[in-house]
Amino acid sequence: MLGFPGSGKTSLFRCLTGKEEPPGASRKPAPGILAWNGVYFQVVDTPPILSESSSGKLMALARNADALILTIDSTMDVYLQLDSLLKLLDDNRITVEKPKAIVEIEKRATGGVTIIGDLINATTQDVISLLREYNIYHAIVRIQGKATLDDIEEAIFGSYAYKPAVVMLTKVDLLDGNTLKSMAEKLMESTSLPVHLFTSTQCSSLRVEEIASYIFKELDLIKVYTRNPKTGEVEKRPIVIKRGAKVIDVARKIHSDLYKNFKYARIWSPRLVFSPQKVGRDFQLEDGDIIEIVA
């Protein structure tokens, strides 16, 4: 959570996590837990941004976070606040605009160059030649999306970190209806980010379902539920994995023995013609699937 002094972060944090903070606590990062559909998000209330020069630690927190909540005080200049936050993030090579490709380059001592992902208008040899220009001879290049050579080159110098974000317009109960409607519409026109309204006094005004589901979707995550082969009981708390994950990835995440001794799995899902369906290790999972692994 990022915002300027008095932006309503602490009230929002309390409503999201149910955790009360004592006076002055916001001078240090404060963690809390947001529960949603069996998934637990760690929410961190950060100290208010006082100046660009004092925001280094906050930007380090933002870079390490999976997603951002930008709190904007509706009683102040909302456009200046949002622009200032986005500029500060951009200055620290953090973007809230989803790029066409995300490239990570992991240097290593041996093994040559391995590319995982898709290229546009370039070949593997083009990438190898480019990396050699920067004295990189051994590396794993991971691509999410489809990357150009320019994307690869930018990643060499430290690519932008993409963070899904939502804008929380706080203290909206202090504005009249027409002013709030006009402000919210203009703000939504000025950014591609979803804008949510929060009264700062009533937690019921918070649309947790919309916020959590948006972040979950933008992070490209899915939920799968495990079924006990002995009892038939389905675990209420899901396993969270990246979209595109396979059955064997879940086996590895549950226990190394399931991964090593994997035989097959059964999948329960409305999308399947036959449910349950017996599948192998490379079967791709979807959100809401129920999985039973036999080893």
Give each language-model segment a name:
Residues K98, I102-I105, G111-H138, R142-A147, ...:
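Canonical P-loop GTPase G-domain recognition
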Residues E235-K246:
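Short, contiguous acidic and Ser/Thr-rich linear segments
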Residues Y264-R281:
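Short acidic beta-strand-loop surface patches of small beta-rich interaction domains
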